[in-house]
């Protein structure tokens, strides 16, 4: 191989998958600083990819254990929006295929918005089935947020296109005959729950952005309904909306004044 330019070396390293590659052996002997920097970057990327693979395998242990028992339709379930002062609570149930793999998959709260959007599209494309459950602020006020979350999860399961054989749920037990395991911080421990958290989060964020367009004075597209200073000040100035949860403090106190 003739001596390549730095740019050519960069393109080659994108193709090279192993240190055993003859082209890599030539590049590693190239003493130019630019090439050595690229080699160092290549090693770091490989190390990161390996760590992501190990993390993914660790997060697949619940699903793999159930598959070993002959189960196929394993639904991960998670919720988003228990804490906000406005907007619905949204849940998702996701059944993933055995060969599903997205490196870097994690709890939706730990991902950037851009990554969540990308993963959302990939999960949508690969999942066997996805069900979403949405419970309005009015129902939250009627039955309380805990019961509303439970109801939204049951709705998400009912909205799946196939009946799950097993449920993996983030920190909740559901009144259903379907066998289940409740996992504390499940969105960081199970790929199915993690996928559900991303579907639920992106779905709810999009709804809150639409609400932001409808009521620009409240800034819903920025705080997603949480009780930020900006949000509380907007309520003080412009009043309580039908999208607000009247049973939540401090809105409850504002109404009673």
Swiss-Prot record:
Give me the comment on cofactor binding: Manganese or magnesium. Binds 1 divalent metal ion per monomer in the absence of substrate. May bind a second metal ion after substrate binding.
Q: Does the keyword Manganese apply?
A: yes
Note whether Nuclease occurs among the keywords. yes
Instruction: List the EC numbers from the record.
Output: 3.1.26.4
Which cofactors does this protein require?
Mn(2+); Mg(2+)
Q: Name one GO biological process term.
A: DNA replication, removal of RNA primer
Q: What CDD domains would the database entry show?
A: RNase_HII_bacteria_HII_like
- Alphabetical list of Gene3D superfamilies matching this protein: Ribonuclease H-like superfamily/Ribonuclease H
Among the GO molecular function terms of this UniProt record, one is:
RNA-DNA hybrid ribonuclease activity
Which residues does a divalent metal cation bind? 78-79, 170
* Record key words, sorted: Cytoplasm, Endonuclease, Hydrolase, Manganese, Metal-binding, Nuclease
Q: Which residues form the RNase H type-2 domain?
A: 72-257
Coiled coil segments of this chain:
none
Q: What is its main location?
A: cytoplasm
What this protein catalyses is: Endonucleolytic cleavage to 5'-phosphomonoester
Q: Which GO terms describe its cellular component?
A: cytoplasm; ribonuclease H2 complex
**Subcellular location per the Swiss-Prot or TrEMBL entry:** Cytoplasm
Q: Which family does it belong to?
A: Belongs to the RNase HII family.
Entry function: Endonuclease that specifically degrades the RNA of RNA-DNA hybrids.
Q: What is this protein called?
A: Ribonuclease HII
Q: Which organism is it from?
A: Bacillus cereus (strain ZK / E33L)
- Species lineage: Bacteria, Bacillati, Bacillota, Bacilli, Bacillales
